[in-house]
Regions:
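Acidic donor-binding loop of glycosyltransferase active sites
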Residues: 36-50, 63
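Conserved acidic donor-binding segment of nucleotide-sugar-dependent glycosyltransferases
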Residues: 79-80, 84-91, 100-106
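A short, well-ordered alpha-helix in the C-terminal region of glycosyltransferases
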Residues: 100, 107-123, 132-135
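Short hydrophobic beta-strand element within catalytic cores of glycosyltransferases
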Residues: 64-67, 77
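Glycosyltransferase donor-sugar binding loop
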Residues: 1-7
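C-terminal alpha-helical cap of glycosyltransferases
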Residues: 126-144
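Nucleotide-activated donor-binding/catalytic signature segment of Leloir-type glycosyltransferases, i.e.
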Residues: 7-26
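Short alpha-helical donor nucleotide-sugar binding micro-motif in glycosyltransferases
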Residues: 27-28, 34-38, 53
Length: 144
């Protein structure tokens, strides 16, 4: 990520006293294991991504997601149901969403997990995404 933004996030983590709780990771080879270790997954990109892959992967593992409110995250995260969307680059909003996520009860987390898994199964399986892509081609390409 961006060094300045990472430093801002680290400062926010310090301000809320969560240094031993929140871990900003670098590259990881075993993402399913990383997701299973997480109570909440953050995808705080400052530039829009075409598809919110991190959010979709985390949701498939039943993890709530806090994501920047732009790009593909708007399709993969349902604000208030499967996670939270925050303005890109707004570390205060990110900290507030994280505070909310970390203070959820077990029952609330379980509800979010069920919603997240259901959302991925309904919209982001390979057959569903292929069907959606083919439907777009069918709509756009002229028939002979």
């Amino acid at each position: 990520g961006r060094t300045g933004y990472r430093e801002e996030l680290e400062a926010q983590i310090g301000r809320i006293g969560a240094e031993g709780i929140i871990h900003l990771t670098g590259p990881c080879r075993d993402m399913p294991a990383a997701y299973m270790l997480a109570d909440v997954v953050i995808s705080a990109s400052t530039d829009p991504e075409a598809f919110g892959r991190v959010a979709a992967e985390a949701h498939a593992m039943g993890r709530p997601v806090i994501a920047s409110d732009h790009g593909g995250a708007r399709e993969t995260v349902i604000a208030g149901e499967t996670g939270w969307l925050v303005p890109p680059g707004d570390s205060d909003a990110l900290a507030q969403a994280l505070r909310t996520a970390l203070t959820m009860t077990t029952e609330e987390r379980d509800t979010v997990a069920r919603r997240a898994i259901a959302h991925v199964r309904e919209h982001f399986t390979k057959p569903q995404m292929c069907a959606s892509t083919l439907a777009v081609y069918e709509e756009l390409l002229p028939r002979k």
